[in-house]
Amino acid sequence: MDILKSEILRKRQLVEDRNLLVENKKYFKRSELARKEEEAYYERCGYKIQPKEDDQKPLTSSNPVLELELAEEKLPMTLSRQEVIRRLRERGEPIRLFGETDYDAFQRLRKIEILTPEVNKGLRNDLKAALDKIDQQYLNEIVGGQEPGEEDTQNDLKVHEENTTIEELEALGESLGKGDDHKDMDIITKFLKFLLGVWAKELNAREDYVKRSVQGKLNSATQKQTESYLRPLFRKLRKRNLPADIKESITDIIKFMLQREYVKANDAYLQMAIGNAPWPIGVTMVGIHARTGREKIFSKHVAHVLNDETQRKYIQGLKRLMTICQKHFPTDPSKCVEYNAL
């Protein structure tokens, strides 16, 4: 009994020492006791407790909506009405609310872009963007006007001048796949840019009314899209960091194209793009134990077209250049893919 009384007395003395009980109150919060004990522990250990300044900060620093409402009168309208409509439609928002002005719609778009950033930017329609760019070029020509007799070249596609011929490239192709990776990458880059230039020259040589037709604009947009798709591949080739398995497959494709063996080039392309296992790698790990197919998955059996969007794009661009190469540098029908299909 004496032990219990002494323990009660010790607890009461501890509460009095911590100054937890306020006047006219017979209870205290346990969180306050824990905080006092923590402060006493830090003092014994020699730590300095810094006062919290959370209460001194204004509420506007953590409220972006309030900040936008305070600053919206100061921001001028920096986008055209057409651009505001396009961005609102991309996000599935109405282009105008009831009683809303153009400036109000611009402010609403600005709030949406800040509060809900765009997460599916990689899923844009690249072909439509290229078509819009070509339409804008023709519109600029109409607005700017053109003198009679002036040569219409401002809407022509950009041509990569490689200062080489197909005969020189065919001679270089004899050394492909001989073990010199840097030389192989240089030949691949030169040949692909040569094909892009051949394609652009063909499109630039069309009549003006053909360029302005729907099919003509589509062909020009396809060439622009292919060029943009191949930029990551050219960057990897220039920096010498192209994956070894893809580099080996592209080397085989280019070698067969220079030999005008288009059927073999198409087989090598399918081997690279789809492989012998056209499914993701996780399929072999469905059960508790790995299946036997797991042992057979290596570089030639992986579907590279499924890896990421960038690889899918430049693999698709490579296939388009294979078609252009077959069209401009034909061979025997038995060595062609879909002969006269273009």
From Swiss-Prot:
Residue intervals passing through the bilayer: none
Cell location: Nucleus speckle
A Pfam family assignment: Prp18
One GO CC annotation: nuclear speck
Keyword vocabulary terms for this entry: Acetylation, mRNA processing, mRNA splicing, Nucleus, Spliceosome
Family assignment from sequence similarity: Belongs to the PRP18 family.
Subunit relationships: Heterodimer with PPIH. Interacts with PRPF4 and with the spliceosome. Part of a complex containing U4/U6 snRNPs.
Name of this chain's protein: Pre-mRNA-splicing factor 18
